[in-house]
């Protein structure tokens, strides 16, 4: 394909580009259509019609064209990952693994990610500058945790005041620890100073407890969470929260957050509350499904599999409850370490749970809306940024194609051809 077209990758062309011969699945939920797509100055000029005489042609015969995929729950800094969350490698190795992770992510068709904890602003800036290929990154910077909460990932015997030493300025920013509204307000402001585009708080324990926490724990008070919401609103952005149990979720909704991460224990009553307050949900099924199959990947005993299996089943039920209640349900992978190259599995899990079209909508239009970029991303429509992915094969008919990254034959990012020729 690359040899046939002669189109180089990596640069935005001044000449208009006409995508010819593909089947367009535009992300709106409408039926697929055989239509050309005209790209001009990094945006979609129109869908359909005939090719302008002066436009360069990119042959997309046999490809299913979808909007650039969005993963709304990633940890790009967790590319080198050890179950103990201690790094025994150099900063150079950490950076190299993160850069490879970014390249693999965009090559898999994810043109945008929302990093929900782990990277400092530097990584997003490097990609934005064009020095390195990778997805567009919206980052929260360091997550906000109470002392002893999920964001304090050092050993239990490690003094709290040493936790900041785990960060790598400009590259890795794990978390800031706060106790009380005033300290949290200061740390949220510090996160914004360091380039955060939104705020993430940890308000319940995790399924895989890093220290002494449990999924049933609630963390931060409603008053503390409300302070973070106030600071985020002052900057025109929002707060999302890591939350599994219903009590923590209800506290966060009462405080004014806009999004819930994971939400694995959401029941019908809580789902109705989310819908009432227009709070979105970003479920993360893949990480739990993977751990059910291989608990040792997180250093867990085989006996942990039964607990993980219960949470995986509950998470699937939570997605269905939220969808039935009318909640905006996005999509996130939450993958860690080298397994991040398998983030596309999330679409397959969701396709099997709901439908391929709904999985695609969650990974495009709905995610774009959740992360605040709905005016520019998420659909193949006139005026949107030209983030487009071409699959060799139809993932709506064969959802396994979502997870087969070698079928991603074309990736455009703001009109730049990032990948062309694979899978044909």
Spans of model-derived segments:
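Metal-associated gating/positioning segment near the N- to mid-region
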Residues: 63-129, 147-154, 223, 254-255
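His/Asp/Glu-enriched, well-ordered alpha-helical/loop segment
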Residues: 234, 299-303, 311-395
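Divalent metal-dependent hydrolysis catalytic cores, especially in the metallo-beta-lactamase
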Residues: 96-123, 134-143, 196-210, 238, ...
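Histidine-rich, glycine-flanked metal-binding segment
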Residues: 2-18, 24-67
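Histidine/acidic-residue-rich catalytic or RNA/ligand-binding cores of hydrolases
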Residues: 80-83, 125, 151, 209-210, ...
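C-terminal cap of metal-dependent C-N hydrolases
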Residues: 22-25, 362-365, 369, 382-424
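Histidine/acidic residue-rich metal-binding segments in metalloenzymes
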Residues: 181-281, 297, 308-329, 375
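Active-site mouth loops of central-metabolism enzymes
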Residues: 83-96, 163-186, 238-240
């Amino acid at each position: 394909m690359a040899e046939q077209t002669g189109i180089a990758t990596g640069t935005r062309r001044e000449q208009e580009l006409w995508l010819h011969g593909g089947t367009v699945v535009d992300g709106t939920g409408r039926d697929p259509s055989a239509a050309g797509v005209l790209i001009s100055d990094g945006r979609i000029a129109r869908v359909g019609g005939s090719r302008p005489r002066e436009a360069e042609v990119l042959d997309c015969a046999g490809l299913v064209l979808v909007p650039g995929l969005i993963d709304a729950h990633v940890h790009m800094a967790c590319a080198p990952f050890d179950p103990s969350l201690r790094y025994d490698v150099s900063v150079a190795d950490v950076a190299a693994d993160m850069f490879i992770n970014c390249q693999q992510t965009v090559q898999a068709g994810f043109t945008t990610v929302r990093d929900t904890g782990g990277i400092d602003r530097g990584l997003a800036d490097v990609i934005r500058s064009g020095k390195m290929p990778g997805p567009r990154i919206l980052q929260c910077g360091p997550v906000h945790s109470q002392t002893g909460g999920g964001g304090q990932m050092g050993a239990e015997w490690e003094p709290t005041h040493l936790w900041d030493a785990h960060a790598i300025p400009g590259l890795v920013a794990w978390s800031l620890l706060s106790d009380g509204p005033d300290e949290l307000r200061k740390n949220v402001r510090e996160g914004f100073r360091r380039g955060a585009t939104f705020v993430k708080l940890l308000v319940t324990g995790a399924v895989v407890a890093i220290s002494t926490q449990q999924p049933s724990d609630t963390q931060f008070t409603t008053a503390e969470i409300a302070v973070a919401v106030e600071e985020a609103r002052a900057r025109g952005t929002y707060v999302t929260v890591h939350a599994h149990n219903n009590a923590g979720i209800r506290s966060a909704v009462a405080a004014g957050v806009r999004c819930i991460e994971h939400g694995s224990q959401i029941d019908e009553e809580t789902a109705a509350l989310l819908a009432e307050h227009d709070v979105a949900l970003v479920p993360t099924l893949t990480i739990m499904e993977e751990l059910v199959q291989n608990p040792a990947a997180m250093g867990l005993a085989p006996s942990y599999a039964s607990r993980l299996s219960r949470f995986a089943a509950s998470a699937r039920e939570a997605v269905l409850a939220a969808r039935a209640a009318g909640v905006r349900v996005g999509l996130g992978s939450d993958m860690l370490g080298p397994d991040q190259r398998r983030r596309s599995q999330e679409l397959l899990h969701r396709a099997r749970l709901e439908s391929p079209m709904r999985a695609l909508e969650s990974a495009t239009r709905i995610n774009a809306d959740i992360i605040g970029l709905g005016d520019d991303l998420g659909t193949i429509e006139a005026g949107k940024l030209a983030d487009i992915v071409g699959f060799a094969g139809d993932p709506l008919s064969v959802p396994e194609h979502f997870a087969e990254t070698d079928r991603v034959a074309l990736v455009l990012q703001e009109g730049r051809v990032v990948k062309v020729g694979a899978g044909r």
